[in-house]
Regions:
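Short, conserved turn/kink motifs that form compact alpha/beta structural patches or helix kinks used as
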Residues: 2-3, 26-120
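N-terminal intrinsically disordered, low-complexity, charge/repeat-rich segments that act as generic
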Residues: 1-22
Length: 120
């Protein structure tokens, strides 16, 4: 028996849901002094930044850690680079974050539908 998948039209992330702007500086290299070098920043418009708070316990002390997931749509977000690189910097609300995970999400084709980027 052959399974026939129905065609799907997956809508893009809604523009009214993409309420934030970020600045992205792509990781370039480490120079000979072990300093990280970044590309010139680009402003990406119409993204969503969702924060989460976790408590980390190390020995006798504990601290709060703020992580975020950034949603970037392939159609509705503006000034989107072709790819995102781990170790790159994201600036949001005056604070710098480092990309630790890039998840390209595909809907029904080989082209990216949106990205989910985890930062710390």
């Amino acid at each position: 028996m052959k399974v026939v998948k129905p065609p799907t039209n997956v809508p893009q992330l809604p523009l009214d849901w993409l309420i934030h702007n970020i600045s992205y500086e792509a990781y370039k290299e480490e120079n000979r002094h072990n300093e990280v070098v970044y590309e010139q920043g680009v402003e990406i418009e119409h993204v969503r930044v969702d924060f989460s708070k976790s408590n980390q316990i190390a020995g006798l002390s504990d601290s709060d850690r703020y992580d975020a997931v950034i949603f970037i749509d392939a159609v509705n977000s503006m000034n989107v680079p072709d790819d995102f690189i781990s170790r790159s910097k994201i600036y949001f609300s005056g604070k710098a974050y480092k990309i630790v995970k890039v998840i390209p999400c595909f809907a029904t084709s080989n082209s990216v539908h949106h990205w989910e980027i985890e930062v710390v």
